[in-house]
Amino acid sequence: MRTALLEVGLEELPASEFHSILKQLEEKSAELLKAYRVSSGSVEVFVGSRRFGVILKNLPERQEDFTEEKKGPPLNVAYDENGKPTRALEGFLRNNNASLENVVHREGYVYLSRVVEGKPVEEVLPDLFRDLVLGLNFRKPMRWGSGEHEYIRPVHWIVAMVDGRVLDLEIFGLRSSRISYGKRYHAGSIEIPDSERYYESLKKGFVISSHLERKKFVLEQIDEFEKRSSMKIERDEELIEEIVAITEYPRIVVGQFDRKYLELPEEIIVTAVKHHQRSFIAHKGTLTNTFVAFQDGPQPPENVVKGYERVINARLEDARYYFQKDLETPLEKMNEKLKEIVFQEKLGTLYDKVERIKKISQRLCEDLKLPGSFTQKVLEAASICKADIASKVVYEFPELQGVMGRIYALREGINEEIATAIEDHYSEEPQTVIGSILGIADRIDTIVGNFAIGNVPTSSKDPYGLKSKADTIFRIIRKNEWDISLEELLTFASSLVGYRLSEELETFFAGRFYQFLINELGISFDVARAVNHLWKKPLRGILSAEALQEISEKPEFQDLFVGFERVHNITKNHDSTKFDGALFEKEEEKKLMNKFYEVKEKVLKALERLNYREALQYLIELKPYIDEYFDNVFVMVKRDDLRVNRLSFLKNIDELFMMVGDMTYLVKRSQV
């Protein structure tokens, strides 16, 4: 078995593309191996800051053989009246380098059918690797040189080998070779003797090509530091992944910043050091002034440590200055400054947005029937929920939006419940009631406002993150078990920006509700479709979905779905629910009517308690009465008044079922 290697060497890759490249390499390698009929025991992909590629192990000597078929002339054209080949057939065979032995007859035509022997793997791999490299997609490709080529970054070298043999491959005007390059400024060219020794060869040039091995190396160095220092480092997965993405030979750097900066709020210190210097802060019960960073290359000299310390101290000094200046300005005054900050040109300033958030929050409090004293707390929190955006610290460190609002509010002696909500309302899973109310109000205002001015997300583009905001609204409603009308809330929010609730906006929320049920709650596709019309009251839709999901697999409920389908199909084009029981001629009509009234009362009471499982149990009581009705009553009679009256009566049953879900989808599933 053989081993193949592809390495593409480029200028420094953006860390933001790291996971995308990794995923694409894995998926496209598998696709191309299948397309080129090459089996591989394992596929190892690697991505570094200056290279990416793939190692294919346990490759066969050749492609798999395949049977080639080609359609030829019709039989009446291919043979004469004596059954001998005509010139048409002979020409077809000659052009395809085939003989009569390869001919088969099917569906009135001549077909060539022959086994094509697979090519040697070294002849196949160049095309496979070329397709792999050129098949990757990037958000922001760039051109270089004469502008002829476009890629994520300029490509400087290509290594393509099978075992110890260099493959004949050319991409971007570069011919493949066995020469790679080590860490910039620390190692020059590196000759790869064969594919199996790729990783060990690169290590000599201070390059750990495998991202998995780099991550392991980072964690080992952190473990060693903790044992040596008796301090702890929080394993921040996001930061670790970023370090792995931007380095090829990560070596630990341990330094200290001035202890006076420990007087700053911990969030400021961590943000300044983590987000802006990609460093960890060591803990020893509490935050210490020791930081851990990672330098790319060999063991860093002392001047590198000093450089890190100088930069971090300067960053923290700036943060201290901004923080002290902010403490001189109350949140109320910061809020006034929002009048000078544009939220969106057509939607006014951030101050305007805050005013809308207050109104939507108040409406939500009314819908939830919250006491006036609590509503007042909500409105106080809403009035300052964006104030810290005008602060100097948030201007410098946008990641601290909301966090600084909480800190400043507590410093001013503002109620802790209100202060916490300022930060909490930004969360995708708010932990407080006030934060949840503000979170819904803020997101609804953003979504409605963007739809009002034409910023509508598509399947591929959502620059304002409206889909995620809608998902969070559903998540908050479910967590708090709030039985509210989202439709009414959207209508109210729309009026605040001079907009009318549109079909486009309704379709958007219905679509997000469907995805939320499937992706977050694990609801099956058919059940999600069955309750999708209930998105306007999300909690009811969610509870209905969970109840239907639970019972839809039980045999005793399959009859219920069939009964509903009979009613639904005959009434789907009928709108009226007004009927006169005096017009009923048959006993089965009267029996179903009486049972309907009995069941309806019980179902409505169950739904009032949000008990959808109980409601479904009551609905099943209708099944035998529905069967008797359809067995003995002909609905579509010629007499107009009887026909319309019967349809209108059945429409009542249909609408009662629809309050729980459109079970026709579940009927279809049960019949699969």
From Swiss-Prot:
InterPro entries hit by this protein: DALR_anticod-bd, Gly-tRNA-synth_bsu, Gly-tRNA-synth_heterodimer, tRNAsynth_Ia_anticodon-bd
Reaction catalysed by this enzyme: tRNA(Gly) + glycine + ATP = glycyl-tRNA(Gly) + AMP + diphosphate
Pfam families: DALR_1, tRNA_synt_2f
Localisation per UniProt entry: Cytoplasm
EC annotation from Swiss-Prot or TrEMBL: 6.1.1.14
Keyword Aminoacyl-tRNA synthetase: yes
Keywords: Aminoacyl-tRNA synthetase, ATP-binding, Cytoplasm, Ligase, Nucleotide-binding, Protein biosynthesis
GO BP terms in the entry: arginyl-tRNA aminoacylation; glycyl-tRNA aminoacylation
GO cellular component: cytosol
Single Gene Ontology MF annotation: ATP binding
Keyword Transcription part of the UniProt annotation: no
Family: Belongs to the class-II aminoacyl-tRNA synthetase family.
Quaternary assembly: Tetramer of two alpha and two beta subunits.
Name of the molecule in the record: Glycine--tRNA ligase beta subunit
Lineage, highest ranks first: Bacteria, Thermotogati, Thermotogota, Thermotogae, Thermotogales
